[in-house]
Regions:
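Conserved beta-hairpin
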Residues: 57-69
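Conserved acetyl-CoA-binding loop-helix of GNAT-fold acetyltransferases
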Residues: 89-102, 126
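A short, internal acetyl-CoA/4′-phosphopantetheine-binding micro-motif in the GNAT/acyltransferase core
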Residues: 78-88
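Conserved GNAT acetyl-CoA-binding A-motif
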Residues: 104-117
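A short helix-loop-beta-strand connector motif used in the catalytic cores of GNAT acetyltransferases and
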Residues: 44-60, 77
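Conserved N-terminal entry element of GNAT/NAT acetyltransferase domains
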Residues: 1-14, 150-156
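Conserved active-site alpha-helix within GNAT-family acetyltransferase domains
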Residues: 94, 118-144
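Conserved GNAT-fold acetyl-CoA-binding loop/helix
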Residues: 17, 21-47
Length: 156
């Protein structure tokens, strides 16, 4: 599925929040207890998303006028990559990651790190990320993954 990848705007916050919460409740809920999902969900209220928009570089994937994915870059750290549950497996996440990589390379960043959920571990591994270590926040298990960027082969 080809999407338009564009920078997120403040007026996208509600749609981004809905998308992330739907992905958490549908996809991530298969790998994490309900209490963890409820805790993580609080980080993505419309208000919280608006705050993130002022702190990070956030992009959205849009198809037919609808936001179907989001991802952000915080320096060299990839954060909050989510795709609408009904669009997962259609290349939306890969397109978002390609844009993050382009942005990182243009900023002189040569390595990306991602604190991955166990749900997304396979996705990142398929993009060439390798697991460095595990990290726990209470019951939430996160995998710290990393990938070297290559200026000549930056199309995922």
């Amino acid at each position: 599925m080809d999407c338009e990848i564009r920078p997120a705007h403040e007026q996208d916050a509600d749609a981004i929040s809905r998308l992330i919460i739907a992905a958490l409740q549908t996809s991530n809920a298969q790998d994490y207890p309900a209490a963890v999902i409820a805790q993580v969900r609080q980080n993505f209220s419309p208000h919280a998303v608006r705050q993130l928009l002022s702190k990070r570089q956030v992009w959205v994937a849009q198809a037919a006028g609808e936001i179907v994915g989001t991802a952000s870059l915080d320096g060299q750290v990839v954060r909050s990559v989510f795709v609408a549950p009904e669009r997962q497996g259609q290349g939306v996440g890969r397109q978002l990651m390609a844009e993050l990589e382009r942005q990182a390379l243009s900023a002189g960043i040569t390595q990306l790190t991602v604190p991955s959920s166990i749900t997304a571990e396979g996705f990142y591994a398929n993009l060439g990320f390798r697991t460095l270590r595990e990290q726990y926040h209470g019951e939430e298990r996160t995998l710290i993954m990393q990938r070297e960027l290559d200026q000549t082969t930056h199309n995922l």
